[in-house]
């Protein structure tokens, strides 16, 4: 049984736009992680923890959107 999920062209364009936005933001977040890492002790480094959390969130959303896009039919 085919359980295809359909999406409009505009919907797919919005999905791709969001993926592209996240991919553009990712290098900035990676730089923020590197800068925060230079502050020293990572166990008490709030900037580092926040930057790593943002990086994880971006990576998770990119992964989710890419998997979702692969399942959709326009």
Question: Where are these predicted regions, by residue range?
Answer:
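Helix-rich terminal scaffold detector
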Residues: 1-63
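Structured alpha/beta interaction-core segments
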Residues: 68-74
